[in-house]
């Protein structure tokens, strides 16, 4: 092993950047370099001045924001007091993961690259801008970028003479060693850690909130099962405002856990402790020590996700069957990504299903590889759909249950939505560990500022929270555009809106797309209400918000709004765009969309 160390630091929101960082780490090991892979916020940033070689891998979230696990690092790096030559000894490179269908494409990676240059760092390569929209997905950029990175790096930091790189099919050592206990420990509290009564819940110390209400709000004849779910947060110290989100981690189904135990011949009731094989690696903070196999598989490892390319790379190193090895190596290669997409991504085949498709290779897997093979279950976020001012000690959400068919026989289900929908408080106490995170939507403090909200479908959730909060504060200038398929089937919170309209607390404009021959969407209603909107925006300094599915709706609503500016304000197309850009810059136009 070389005396040179490559440090791979990542900022990841959904786990993709972390997976890429770990893949770079394995490539470094194969090239006989020492390596450490770490989240940016767990790394002691003051040590950066003494590092020699660092790769930064970062995603962009929301409106060009850094991921949660690099925010502390981000604030430190942009301190104005840092000297211009702080990082003059550092060789580094930045790889960004993004989606060019969003306006702030790879904004974090670009800004980080620029800041590192300002601080005197020697950039080994131009910033890598991986794109989900690329024909080959992010790997279409990542693969050639990494090829250039290793050529440059190995010329500066060559491995020791006589040490050849490890082949792709050679096994790397596991990250952790499992030590099984001969006896079951007494009285273990694996599931819920107690929350300090004086502090707010965090990802590592979530609040076990009783789920007290779970009811379908769509008509039984409607294709989509949408739930109104309520949690009791009494005694949690949780505070939140309109626009904030509630976070939680789902559990795997007992059926999937049992199936994996059978495949790998594991006893779910056995207990173990973990020791890292590298002294610089720590045991995952969310795993209790000792821990049961059942807890590991049910609460920690993401066994039902669609596996990434790295899953197949690792699996290929265990293949003894020639046909299975050939297929796994193809899936691991740059040339095989189309085939992998057809096999795995398009039909949404899960990691568990892949293991059953490769029985000989699966039989070679040992338990020590579980934490290398499967990523950790990532937290899910939901817009809070209620206000503490109207519902004290409660958090409410609107949950669309994800279920769909692909070419596979078994229907695909969303892990978190299916898990939450299955929880029934009428059959006994149900607890969901959760915490709250600040959202990207900010509502005006000025009581005179009107608020215009466009929230079709479950996109209405943050606006229900905002309207409840604003009405409780005496702010009545609220306009809501709500869209759904049918007034009788999926008009969420319809009676609540009507009550508030009757009380003079809001204006409601609806678009029921399938209740007449011509489809009517929220963007059509925005155009129809042009005079009202122009008056509120141009004369009364109104704020405009969009929330919902990121397919065509946000763009269509923006186009409709610009058409209003042109018609009612007598503007040219360019002037309308400039007005919208100005509103966005001043925080008067905000959107929160998801795919």
Curated annotation (Swiss-Prot):
Residues holding FAD: 348, 380-383, 414-417, 594
Gene Ontology molecular function, alphabetical: electron transfer activity; flavin adenine dinucleotide binding; FMN binding; NADP binding; NADPH-hemoprotein reductase activity; NADPH-iron-sulfur [2Fe-2S] protein oxidoreductase activity; oxidoreductase activity; oxidoreductase activity, acting on NAD(P)H, heme protein as acceptor
Pfam families (UniProt xref): FAD_binding_1, Flavodoxin_1, NAD_binding_1
EC number: 1.18.1.-
Catalytic activity: 2 oxidized [2Fe-2S]-[protein] + NADPH = 2 reduced [2Fe-2S]-[protein] + NADP(+) + H(+)
Names of required cofactors: FAD; FMN
Flavodoxin-like domain span: 6-150
PROSITE patterns, per database record: FAD_FR, FLAVODOXIN_LIKE
Major location category of this protein: cytoplasm
Domain FAD-binding FR-type per the UniProt entry, residue ranges: 204-444
Residues in the signal sequence: none
Domain of life: Eukaryota
Cellular component terms per the entry's GO annotation: cytosol; perinuclear region of cytoplasm
Binding site for NADP(+): 458, 513-514, 519-523
Protein residues bound to FMN: 12-17, 59-62, 97-106, 132
PANTHER family: NADPH-DEPENDENT DIFLAVIN OXIDOREDUCTASE 1, NITRIC OXIDE SYNTHASE-RELATED
Family per record: Belongs to the NADPH-dependent diflavin oxidoreductase NDOR1 family. In the N-terminal section; belongs to the flavodoxin family.
The protein's role, per its UniProt record: NADPH-dependent reductase which is a central component of the cytosolic iron-sulfur (Fe-S) protein assembly (CIA) machinery. Transfers electrons from NADPH via its FAD and FMN prosthetic groups to the [2Fe-2S] cluster of ciapin1, another key component of the CIA machinery. In turn, this reduced cluster provides electrons for assembly of cytosolic iron-sulfur cluster proteins. It can also reduce the [2Fe-2S] cluster of cisd1 and activate this protein implicated in Fe/S cluster repair.
Protein name per UniProt: NADPH-dependent diflavin oxidoreductase 1
């Amino acid at each position: 092993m070389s005396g040179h160390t490559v440090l791979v630091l990542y900022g990841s929101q959904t786990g993709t950047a972390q997976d890429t960082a770990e893949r770079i780490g394995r490539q470094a090991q194969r090239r006989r370099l020492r390596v450490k892979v770490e989240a940016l916020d767990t790394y002691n940033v003051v040590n950066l001045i003494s590092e020699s070689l660092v790769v930064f891998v970062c995603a962009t979230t929301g409106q060009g924001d850094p991921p949660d696990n690099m925010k502390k690092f981000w604030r430190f790096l942009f301190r104005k007091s840092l000297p211009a030559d702080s990082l003059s000894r550092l060789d580094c490179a930045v790889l960004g993961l993004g989606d060019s269908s969003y306006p702030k494409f790879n904004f974090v990676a670009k800004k980080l690259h620029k800041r590192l240059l300002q601080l005197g760092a020697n950039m080994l390569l131009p910033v890598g801008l991986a794109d989900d929209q690329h024909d080959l997905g992010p790997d279409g950029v990542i693969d050639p970028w990494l090829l250039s990175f290793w050529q440059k790096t190995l010329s500066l930091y060559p491995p020791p003479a006589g040490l050849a790189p490890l082949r792709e099919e050679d096994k790397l050592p596991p990250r952790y060693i499992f030590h099984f206990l001969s006896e079951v420990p007494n009285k273990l509290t694996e599931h819920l850690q107690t929350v300090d009564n004086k502090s707010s819940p965090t990802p590592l110390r979530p609040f076990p909130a009783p789920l007290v209400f779970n009811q379908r709000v769509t008509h039984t004849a409607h294709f989509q099962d949408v739930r109104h779910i309520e949690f009791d947060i009494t005694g949690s110290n949780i505070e939140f405002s309109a626009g904030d989100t509630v976070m939680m981690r789902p559990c795997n189904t007992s059926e999937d856990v049992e199936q994996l135990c059978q495949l790998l011949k594991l006893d779910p009731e056995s207990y173990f402790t973990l020791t890292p094989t590298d002294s610089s690696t720590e045991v995952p903070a969310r795993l209790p020590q000792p821990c049961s196999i059942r807890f590991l598989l049910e609460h920690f490892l993401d066994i039902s996700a669609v596996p990434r390319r790295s899953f197949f790379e690792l699996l290929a190193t265990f293949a003894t069957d020639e046909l299975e090895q050939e297929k796994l190596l193809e899936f691991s290669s740059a040339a095989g990504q189309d085939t992998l997409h057809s096999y795995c991504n398009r039909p949404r085949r899960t990691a568990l299903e892949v293991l059953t498709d490769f029985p000989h290779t699966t039989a070679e897997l040992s338990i020590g590889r579980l934490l290398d093979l499967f990523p950790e279950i990532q937290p899910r976020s939901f817009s809070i759909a209620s206000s503490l001012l109207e519902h004290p000690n409660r958090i409410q959400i609107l949950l669309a249950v994800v279920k769909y068919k692909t070419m596979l026989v078994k229907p695909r289900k969303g892990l978190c939505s299916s898990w939450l929908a299955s929880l029934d408080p009428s059959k006994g106490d149900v607890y969901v560990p959760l915490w709250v995170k600040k959202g990207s939507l900010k509502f005006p403090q000025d009581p005179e500022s009107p608020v215009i909200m466009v929230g079709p479908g479950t996109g209405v959730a943050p606006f229900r929270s905002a309207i409840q909060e604003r009405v409780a504060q005496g702010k009545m200038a609220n306009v809501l555009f709500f869209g759904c398929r049918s007034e009788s089937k999926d008009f969420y919170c319809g009676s609540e809106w009507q009550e508030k309209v009757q009380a003079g607390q809001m204006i409601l404009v609806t678009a029921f797309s399938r209740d007449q021959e011509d489809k009517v969407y929220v963007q059509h209603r925005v155009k129809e209400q042009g005079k009202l909107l122009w008056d509120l925006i141009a004369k009364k300094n109104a704020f405009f918000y969009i929330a919902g599915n990121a397919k065509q709706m946000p763009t269509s609503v923006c186009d409709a709004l610009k058409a209003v500016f042109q018609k009612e304000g007598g503007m040219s197309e360019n002037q309308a765009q400039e007005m919208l850009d100005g509103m966005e810059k001043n925080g008067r136009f905000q959107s929160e969309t998801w795919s």
